[in-house]
Amino acid sequence: MEQNFTLDQIQEVVTAAWAEGKDIPIWAFYAAMGTGKTTFIHALCTMLGVEDAVSSPTFALVNEYQYEGGSLFHMDWYRLGSLEEAIRAGIDEHLHSGDTCLIEWPENVPDLLAGPVFEIRLSRIDEKTRHIYSRVKS
């Protein structure tokens, strides 16, 4: 998928992304700070019926949410500095759980991403408009 969208259109974009990537358990979100990674994940969780408050797990590293299809692990790897640190934090266990993992800042520990990954790349066009490009990377 590749398109421009506004916040008013985010539910449509999230629905299309889920249709494209729902069978891939690892989702990697690439975007600059403030582009809307957490906003996108919040909209996705809303679409999936998550009732918990959705927020960026910058300090906790991982937030777990429940939805009808099971568990979602929302991860923020911004503060991770190495593969060893990620393993000590138990990140690899979530990645191998088979549950959906939504990862912000995956570029900080790229060696953890094995197998198929649903990549979502967001960029800012202007104050109200974002661009999304998604693909499955083997």
Per-range role (PLM):
Residues 1-3, 46, 84-86, 92-138:
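Short phosphate-coordinating micro-motif centered on Lys-Gly-acidic
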Residues 26-28:
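Short hydrophobic/aromatic beta-strand immediately N-terminal to the Walker A/P-loop
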Residues 30-32:
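P-loop (Walker A) phosphate-binding loop of NTP-binding proteins
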Residues 50-65:
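Short beta-strand-centered segment that lines the nucleotide-binding/catalytic pocket of NTP-utilizing
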